[in-house]
């Protein structure tokens, strides 16, 4: 089998903004606008308040802003809280190849880490688009067999997308990006039994936070498997994949 981890790690490390045509950029901006609207509308939802309060209590560093409260917390904390807020009303964008909501994890990671790093809007847009591309393709490979086994692609595939987002913004090289994907393969989680509870929107925040964590650890030298997605007992083979690559 082709190394999926290396394939997407290489793509994420090397893609440029001009890799995407104008139509793709237009729809990316519409998805960003959509997410901002639904996140703002949900900032007083109970799940938004609870998660935002938790990250505020844990806060020891002011890196990125929480939508629900306006407080500045760590970028991981902001990604967690804002991801949950953006998915709280469940009106965020949907991709049916992905079988989930790709923006709800990729964009909170991009905005939080981008704020911490002082990234340009062009860099944030590129990171977001690259992350959505990877999470959607991984979600498409996993397909409905993964979803029908009880997994929530917004959380699982979304974790890989947010890892690409964070890797781009942190300027990780190809090997570091591959390593980050390998690491997040053991973090990506989220089960459909949480649907109908606060656990479902929390999945989006988990995925956003997972990506920042994996990329930052990889940048510091943390070592994981370079085939963590597709290896024996890796992510694909333990998460309902039907062994088909579309």
Label the predicted regions:
Residues 1-246:
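N-terminal core-entry segment
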């Amino acid at each position: 089998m082709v190394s999926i981890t290396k394939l997407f790690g290489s793509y994420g490390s090397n893609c440029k903004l001009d890799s995407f045509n104008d139509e793709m950029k237009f729809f990316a901006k519409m998805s960003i606008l959509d997410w901002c609207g639904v996140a703002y509308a949900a900032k007083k939802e109970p799940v938004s308040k609870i998660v935002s309060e938790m990250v505020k209590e844990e806060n020891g560093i002011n890196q990125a802003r929480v939508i629900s409260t306006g407080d500045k917390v760590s970028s991981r904390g902001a990604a967690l809280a804002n991801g949950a807020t953006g998915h709280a009303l469940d009106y965020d964008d949907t991709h049916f190849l992905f079988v989930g909501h790709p923006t709800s994890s990729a964009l909170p990671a991009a905005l939080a880490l981008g704020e911490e790093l002082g990234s340009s809007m062009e860099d944030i847009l590129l990171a977001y688009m690259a992350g959505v591309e990877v999470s959607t393709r991984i979600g498409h490979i996993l397909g409905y067999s993964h979803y029908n086994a009880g997994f929530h692609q917004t959380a699982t595939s979304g974790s890989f997308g947010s890892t690409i987002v964070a890797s781009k913004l942190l300027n990780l090289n190809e090997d570091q990006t591959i390593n980050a994907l390998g690491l997040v393969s053991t973090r990506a989680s989220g089960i459909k039994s949480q649907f109908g509870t606060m656990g479902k929107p929390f999945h989006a925040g988990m995925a956003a936070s997972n990506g920042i964590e994996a990329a930052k650890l990889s940048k510091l030298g943390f070592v994981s498997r370079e085939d963590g997605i597709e290896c024996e007992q890796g992510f694909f083979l333990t998460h309902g994949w039907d062994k088909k690559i579309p």
